[in-house]
């Protein structure tokens, strides 16, 4: 093992390697309101005590290194070091522990998710003394969160911009995700928006490929938006993906979207990076654009139970970096997502104050103070039969996004959109009348089918479609 010792006033420098726990394991420490707190799930190597492993995590993610260095004496490690202040075994797991680490605020640059993550989830994740390490949760104190702008606009401002209240918003990802020409792509957008959707979406893969350059796509999509608005009398939008190979190109695409007068653009925040995302978020607030966020690559980071970063941490990071929507899983669709865990980080995205609740995976009470909220987006393998459950689970402040569940309608895109809109409004009305959607949701849809042939056709097509697999990431 390897670490660093604290050099106290009057003590001489003693070279060598000493246990991390001598300096970084401090069970007597009382956390401060200004500390950033982290909960790590750690699996030590055989023979490594959990106290030493927890101290190593605190050291290597803050001021420590593998040996004592004489420059320790030029600063105050006691002021700047991370501290492992508690360790608890994980119930039902062999040799797994939750290590709680407190970091002083001065370790991190203000307003920089990039710097925060570089320290807390940096080199320590490759540390040999650990078989595996996962960051389960972070407590971001108001003293730090107030250094971030957060979402460009937030939930209430978005509703005011698009003039839609009292129900979830409806979206659709255009399929096939790759291969359409810009003109045919715009046609699909128009049909979906005219049929009753609020938004359509670029797939996360769509940037500027040879079959459809970004500028052509933006032009045809803008035409589709304005035509559908004129015909329906509703404000419509399409998530134009501004993600690009450089920040300069990304901002150029965002500027062109603003010139066209569209209401919303999109970014892949993990593949694009937090620095790029924060820059784009600032641009969107300054220029009145809503910002939809896709989480492509998240499962590489968050799906394994014992190593990586839980999505609740990535969700908090996005709220600080900036985005008005983010994909959050569906609970009922084709993508990973256990109900209570999903609802836990959905609350972390939307609410101002979230109490500690280990039953939902929330390790710390989180106070966002006045930071705007983010709309969770349920997307992936959902169709009209899921509408009652989605309405009940996610509530009004959400975006329900049906790709194949719109474009796969046997009568075409516009009827597919109409089916989803009718299903949603029927579920919202039934809920508002006091009906239990968990028990009577299917009956609500069958009743609505009597006056919507589009919905009846959709219900017939997808009546047997289910995605019943065991969730990997459980509490």
Curated annotation (Swiss-Prot):
<dbReference type="InterPro" id="IPR017443">
    <property type="entry name" value="RuBisCO_lsu_fd_N"/>
</dbReference>
<feature type="binding site">
    <location>
        <position position="204"/>
    </location>
    <ligand>
        <name>Mg(2+)</name>
    </ligand>
</feature>
<dbReference type="GO" id="GO:0000287">
    <property type="term" value="F:magnesium ion binding"/>
</dbReference>
<feature type="binding site" description="via carbamate group">
    <location>
        <position position="201"/>
    </location>
    <ligand>
        <name>Mg(2+)</name>
    </ligand>
</feature>
<keyword id="KW-1015">Disulfide bond</keyword>
<keyword id="KW-0503">Monooxygenase</keyword>
<dbReference type="GO" id="GO:0009853">
    <property type="term" value="P:photorespiration"/>
</dbReference>
<feature type="binding site">
    <location>
        <position position="295"/>
    </location>
    <ligand>
        <name>substrate</name>
    </ligand>
</feature>
<keyword id="KW-0934">Plastid</keyword>
<dbReference type="InterPro" id="IPR033966">
    <property type="entry name" value="RuBisCO"/>
</dbReference>
<keyword id="KW-0150">Chloroplast</keyword>
<dbReference type="InterPro" id="IPR020888">
    <property type="entry name" value="RuBisCO_lsuI"/>
</dbReference>
<keyword id="KW-0488">Methylation</keyword>
<comment type="function">
    <text>RuBisCO catalyzes two reactions: the carboxylation of D-ribulose 1,5-bisphosphate, the primary event in carbon dioxide fixation, as well as the oxidative fragmentation of the pentose substrate in the photorespiration process. Both reactions occur simultaneously and in competition at the same active site.</text>
</comment>
<feature type="binding site">
    <location>
        <position position="327"/>
    </location>
    <ligand>
        <name>substrate</name>
    </ligand>
</feature>
<feature type="binding site">
    <location>
        <position position="177"/>
    </location>
    <ligand>
        <name>substrate</name>
    </ligand>
</feature>
<feature type="site" description="Transition state stabilizer">
    <location>
        <position position="334"/>
    </location>
</feature>
<comment type="subunit">
    <text>Heterohexadecamer of 8 large chains and 8 small chains; disulfide-linked. The disulfide link is formed within the large subunit homodimers.</text>
</comment>
<feature type="binding site" description="in homodimeric partner">
    <location>
        <position position="123"/>
    </location>
    <ligand>
        <name>substrate</name>
    </ligand>
</feature>
<dbReference type="GO" id="GO:0019253">
    <property type="term" value="P:reductive pentose-phosphate cycle"/>
</dbReference>
<keyword id="KW-0456">Lyase</keyword>
<feature type="propeptide">
    <location>
        <begin position="1"/>
        <end position="2"/>
    </location>
</feature>
<protein>
    <recommendedName>
        <fullName>Ribulose bisphosphate carboxylase large chain</fullName>
        <ecNumber>4.1.1.39</ecNumber>
    </recommendedName>
</protein>
<dbReference type="Pfam" id="PF00016">
    <property type="entry name" value="RuBisCO_large"/>
</dbReference>
<feature type="active site" description="Proton acceptor">
    <location>
        <position position="294"/>
    </location>
</feature>
<feature type="modified residue" description="N-acetylproline">
    <location>
        <position position="3"/>
    </location>
</feature>
<dbReference type="GO" id="GO:0016984">
    <property type="term" value="F:ribulose-bisphosphate carboxylase activity"/>
</dbReference>
<feature type="binding site">
    <location>
        <position position="203"/>
    </location>
    <ligand>
        <name>Mg(2+)</name>
    </ligand>
</feature>
<dbReference type="GO" id="GO:0004497">
    <property type="term" value="F:monooxygenase activity"/>
</dbReference>
<keyword id="KW-0560">Oxidoreductase</keyword>
<dbReference type="Pfam" id="PF02788">
    <property type="entry name" value="RuBisCO_large_N"/>
</dbReference>
<comment type="similarity">
    <text>Belongs to the RuBisCO large chain family. Type I subfamily.</text>
</comment>
<keyword id="KW-0602">Photosynthesis</keyword>
<keyword id="KW-0120">Carbon dioxide fixation</keyword>
<feature type="modified residue" description="N6,N6,N6-trimethyllysine">
    <location>
        <position position="14"/>
    </location>
</feature>
<dbReference type="InterPro" id="IPR020878">
    <property type="entry name" value="RuBisCo_large_chain_AS"/>
</dbReference>
<dbReference type="InterPro" id="IPR036422">
    <property type="entry name" value="RuBisCO_lsu_N_sf"/>
</dbReference>
<dbReference type="InterPro" id="IPR036376">
    <property type="entry name" value="RuBisCO_lsu_C_sf"/>
</dbReference>
<keyword id="KW-0113">Calvin cycle</keyword>
<feature type="active site" description="Proton acceptor">
    <location>
        <position position="175"/>
    </location>
</feature>
<keyword id="KW-0460">Magnesium</keyword>
<dbReference type="GO" id="GO:0009507">
    <property type="term" value="C:chloroplast"/>
</dbReference>
């Amino acid at each position: 093992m390897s670490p660093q010792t604290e050099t106290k006033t009057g003590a001489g420098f003693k070279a060598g390697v000493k246990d991390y726990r001598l300096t970084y394991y401090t069970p007597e420490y009382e956390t401060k309101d200004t500390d950033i707190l982290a909960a790590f799930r750690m699996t030590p190597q055989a023979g490594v005590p959990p106290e030493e492993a927890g101290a190593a995590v605190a050291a290597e993610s803050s001021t420590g290194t593998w040996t004592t260095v004489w420059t320790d004496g030029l600063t105050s490690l006691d002021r700047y070091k991370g501290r492992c202040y508690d360790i608890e075994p994980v119930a039902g797991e062999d040799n797994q522990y939750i290590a709680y680490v407190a970091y002083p605020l001065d370790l991190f640059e203000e307003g920089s998710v990039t710097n925060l993550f570089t320290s807390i989830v940096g080199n320590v994740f490759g540390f040999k003394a650990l078989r595996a390490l996962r960051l389960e949760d972070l407590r971001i104190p108001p003293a730090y969160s107030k250094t971030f702008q957060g979402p460009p606009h937030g939930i209430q401002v978005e509703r005011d911009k698009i003039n839609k209240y009292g129900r979830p918003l409806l979206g659709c990802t255009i399929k096939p995700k790759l291969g359409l020409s810009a003109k045919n792509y715009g046609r699909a957008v128009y049909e979906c928006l005219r049929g009753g959707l609020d938004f359509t979406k670029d797939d996360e893969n769509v940037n500027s490929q040879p079959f459809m350059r970004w500028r052509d796509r933006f032009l045809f999509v803008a035409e589709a938006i304005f035509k559908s608005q004129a015909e329906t009398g509703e404000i419509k939008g399409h998530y134009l993906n501004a993600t690009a190979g450089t920040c300069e190109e990304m901002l150029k695409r965002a500027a062109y979207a603003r010139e066209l007068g569209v209401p919303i653009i999109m970014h892949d925040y993990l593949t694009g990076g937090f620095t790029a995302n924060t820059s784009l978020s600032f641009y969107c607030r300054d220029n009145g654009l809503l910002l939809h966020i896709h989480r492509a690559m998240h499962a590489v980071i968050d799906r394994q139970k014992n190593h990586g970063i839980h999505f609740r941490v990535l969700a908090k990071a996005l709220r600080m970096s900036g985005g008005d929507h983010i994909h959050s899983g569906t609970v009922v669709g084709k993508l990973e997502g256990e109900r209570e865990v999903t609802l836990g980080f959905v609350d972390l995205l939307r609410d101002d104050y979230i109490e500690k609740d280990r039953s939902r995976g929330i390790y710390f009470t989180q106070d966002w103070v006045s930071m705007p909220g983010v709309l969770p987006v349920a997307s992936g393998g959902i169709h009209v039969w899921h509408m009652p459950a989605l309405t009940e689970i996610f509530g009004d402040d959400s975006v329900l996004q049906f790709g194949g569940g719109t474009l796969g309608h046997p009568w075409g895109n516009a009827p597919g959109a109409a089916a989803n809109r009718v299903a949603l409004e029927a579920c919202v009305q039934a809920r508002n009348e006091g009906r239990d959607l968990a028990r009577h949701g299917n009956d609500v849809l069958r009743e609505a089918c009597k006056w919507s042939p589009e919905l009846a056709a959709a219900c017939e097509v997808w009546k047997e479609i289910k995605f019943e697999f065991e969730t990997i990431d459980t509490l």
